[in-house]
Every structure is written in C-alpha cells, then in structure tokens.
Design a protein with these regions (language model features):
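Polar, glycine-rich mid-to-C-terminal structural blocks
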Residues: 12-33, 47
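C-terminal outer-membrane beta-barrel translocator/porin domains of Gram-negative envelope proteins
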Residues: 28-192
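C-terminal beta-signal and terminal closure region of outer-membrane beta-barrel proteins
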Residues: 193-197
C-alpha cells in the first residue's frame, strides 16, 4: 500500500489535508489444497481522502471523507461479466467518518466523552474486504461473535469514561489508573440492490 498526504492548511487550532493512495490486496482460498478461483481475489484500488481536524475549546473534532475506486493496475483481476449479485472489481465506494472527543472535570473527577459516526456507500456489489462490517469491539460493541456486512451502511459509537489515578504507591508500577466506561452503539446495514429487504 502507498499513501501520500499534503497539508493544505494548518494553524494553532486546526489542520486540513488531502491524501492519495494506492493499495493492492490478494486473497487465496483453498479447500483440500484446491484453489477456489471464484473466492480468490486480486483487487487494486485508488484512494482519495480529505481530512479536517479542529480543536474546539478543550474538545477535538475530526472529519474524514474518502473515495475508493477499483482499477485494473498491478495485476488486478478483470471486470469480467458479473451476474446480478456478483461482486464487481471495478467499484466506486464513498466513506465518511466524523468523531468528537471532549475531556472534562466534574466534582473534581476526570471524565471524557467520545463519539464516532462512520459510514460508507456503494452502488456496486463489493468483495468481502471492501464491505462494511458491524459487530465486535471496533464497531458495534455487544455482538462479539456476531457480525453483519454490507456494501453500504454505518455505525455510531458513544462512550463516557471516568478515570482516576492509582494513589497507592506499591501498585503504581503495574497500574497507573482505573475507571469505568459506559457505551452506547448503533448501526445499520443496507441490503444491496440484488437482495430483498
């Protein structure tokens, strides 16, 4: 994977940048030493990104916009003649992520609130690595062993944390702080145009 970034603007409270990238991903799936051609992929994509981060008081907000397009470079597989519902190696995918972090103090205690909303949209049927996934600790928590994937969808994560430094000296070499976190997450997957529902 190759990625180059150009800072468009920077000052004491904000930074704006654009990025260009190129990635190549190859997967090989086998059953009893036999390669499954229809489940093995060679995908190359170009990536265009825009990022803006800004400090607002003691908080910080960050916006990422992205466009990814499947192309035929670096030995990527051809477009072929996909049937209805088959993944397309020449896809267009758009993504957006907005995050906010706000530390604060209340009654002399340290708290922080963070929120992240992210989503992607594609009118094409995507291969599995390009699809958005819900479930697990990195998206919608509470569904560790269950996941949903789709070509288009998104999720919203929220977390409120309380932290306190360890004051007992013998414990500090192993534990610097402890705390409690409350989280609320929600997500949605849109069925692709070849599926009902």
């Amino acid at each position: 994977q190759f990625r180059a970034e150009r800072v468009l603007h920077r000052d004491g409270v904000s930074k704006t940048a654009m990025s260009l990238g190129l990635s190549h991903q190859r997967t090989n799936n086998y059953v009893e030493d036999t390669r499954l051609e229809d489940q093995s992929t060679r995908i190359t994509e170009t990536q265009l990104g825009f990022n803006h981060g800004r400090r607002i008081g003691s908080g910080f907000v960050n916006l990422d916009l992205g466009w990814q397009q499947g192309i035929g470079a670096l030995g990527a597989q051809g477009r072929g003649h996909p049937q209805a519902g088959d993944p397309n190696a020449r896809y267009d995918k758009y993504s957006l992520t907005l995050s906010y972090l706000q530390p604060f103090q209340l009654w002399g205690e340290r708290f922080s609130f963070d929120s992240l909303a992210t989503g992607q949209r594609s009118e094409d049927v995507l291969f599995s690595p390009q699809r958005i996934s819900l479930g697990g600790n990195s998206s919608v928590r509470g569904f560790k062993d269950q996941t949903l994937t789709g070509d288009s969808g998104g999720y919203w994560r929220n977390q409120l944390r309380w932290r306190r430094a360890v004051e007992w000296a013998p414990l500090r070499p192993w534990l610097q702080e402890y705390g409690v976190a409350f989280a609320y997450d929600v997500g949605v997957i849109r069925h692709d145009r070849y599926n009902d529902g």
